[in-house]
UniProtKB/Swiss-Prot annotation:
Annotated positions binding ATP: K46, G53, R54, G55, E99, S102, E107
Annotated signal sequence range: none
Binding site for Mg(2+): N200, D214
Originating species: Coxiella burnetii (strain CbuK_Q154)
Binding-site positions, substrate: N265, G322, I323, V324
Cofactors that this protein relies on: Mg(2+)
Record field: catalytic activity: succinate + ATP + CoA = succinyl-CoA + ADP + phosphate; GTP + succinate + CoA = succinyl-CoA + GDP + phosphate
Protein name: Succinate--CoA ligase [ADP-forming] subunit beta
GO cellular component: cytosol; succinate-CoA ligase complex
Co-factor binding comment: Binds 1 Mg(2+) ion per subunit.
């Protein structure tokens, strides 16, 4: 789960991590009130979306008076911001962060992530702040400093100092501030079950202060059950509606750009199914794993999600009956085709537990459901059917 910048900074403040004074607003008049509360004569207007690259897309603007402020907020609210991290439709702008300006002398990068290779938290820092860290990693990986946290003892102050001096910084007052910030970020990361935390940029002001100018936080979805405060921060308007619907039924769904819908039980089999569709000349429209405990209801909902994608021209169901019974899957398929009114070709491959009974139910249903003879045949059949439609 992702947080907006204003939500991330709200958490940072709880851990005594310095951020600029700011207010989130939902209409232009509130922006003027927010500016008066913040003070000063210049402000930064930031569109709140779950995507990077806002500045280049016009989603971050410097305003020099309250008339410009009101105009900028009015121009952004209710629009969809398209950045290099969004699709062509962009993300809806429903909130604006009005923030005080900062006297920036230097921009740095600071982040933390769970490294799957070492199975530990890794803190990263770079002198290349204010730019996409992915580009730095690609072009100049030597500019990214890393320290790995031993989970038995946690992050240590000497590791913070190691990053500080590695960034070419020397001032002792800044060293203490930097150490406090990194230690605070570590507490935030571990106590709130984060999977990603980025401060980009961490700025040094003209007066030598360190301030977190932007913040990005991702939370481990598997830990949300114990993070009630963070659960309330979820903004489903920033998420794909199909993926949101799938989560409600505990379905693992990821939308893709193809036209062949896939419904499979098991993540490995689902990926193999997509590979075989590609090898057969087709393009998968999604990854959808109904899981090992698939029920008739979940299969029906899975069909609804796939069918709601207007790009889908055919559906391939690939089920291996280990834990799940193929006859129950067949019941779900029949129910879904009737209820949803599927008007595209459906190819089904059933193998394993009660596969013959499931195939018989499909054959006796009287519906236009194509039974495949095997894995490869299923992929070839659906690609052929979709090709006929195209």
């Amino acid at each position: 789960m992702n947080l907006h910048e204003y939500q991330s900074k709200h958490l940072l403040k709880k851990y005594n991590i310095p951020v600029p004074a700011s207010e989130v607003v939902f209409n232009p008049d509130a922006a003027v009130d927010a500016a008066a509360k913040i003070g000063g004569d210049r402000w930064v207007v930031k569109a709140q979306v779950h995507a990077g690259g806002r500045g280049k897309a016009g989603g971050v603007r410097l305003v020099k008076n309250k008339e410009e402020l009101k105009s900028a907020v009015k121009a952004l609210l209710g629009t969809r911001l398209v950045t290099y991290q969004t699709d062509e439709r962009g993300q809806p702008v429903n909130q604006i962060l009005v923030e005080q300006t900062s006297d920036i002398a230097r921009e740095l990068y600071l982040g933390a992530v769970i490294d799957r290779a070492s199975q530990r938290i890794v803190f990263m820092a770079s002198t290349e702040g204010g730019v996409e860290i992915e580009k730095v990693a690609e072009k100049s990986p030597e500019k990214i400093l890393k320290v790995t946290v031993d989970p038995a003892i946690g992050l240590q102050p000497f590791q913070c100092r190691q990053l500080f001096f590695g960034l070419g910084l020397q001032d002792l007052k800044q060293m203490r501030s930097f150490t406090d910030i990194v230690m605070g970020l570590y507490r935030l990361f571990t106590e709130r079950d984060l999977s990603l935390l980025e401060i980009n940029p961490l700025v040094i002001t003209g007066s030598g202060e360190l301030i977190c100018l932007d913040a990005k936080i991702n939370i481990d979805d598997s830990a949300l059950y114990r993070q009630s405060e963070l659960r309330e921060m979820r903004d489903t308007t920033q998420e794909d509606e199909h993926e949101t619907m799938a989560q409600q039924w505990e379905l693992n769904y990821i939308k893709l750009d193809g036209n062949i819908g896939c419904m499979v039980n098991g993540a490995g089999l689902a990926m193999a199914t997509m590979d075989l569709i590609k090898l057969s000349g087709g393009d998968p429209a999604n990854f959808l794993d109904v899981g090992g405990s698939a029920t008739k209801e979940r299969v029906t909902e899975a069909f609804k999600i796939i069918a709601s994608d207007k790009n889908v021209k055919g559906i391939l169901v690939n089920i291996f009956g280990g834990i799940v019974r193929c006859d129950l899957i067949a019941d779900g398929i029949i129910s879904a085709v009737k209820e949803v009114g599927i008007d595209v070709p459906v190819v089904v491959r059933l193998e394993g537990n009660n596969a013959q009974l499931g195939a018989k139910k499909l054959a006796d249903s009287g519906m236009n459901i194509i039974a495949a003879k095997g894995f490869a045949d299923a992929a070839e059949q659906i690609v052929k059917q979709v090709g006929v439609i195209a």
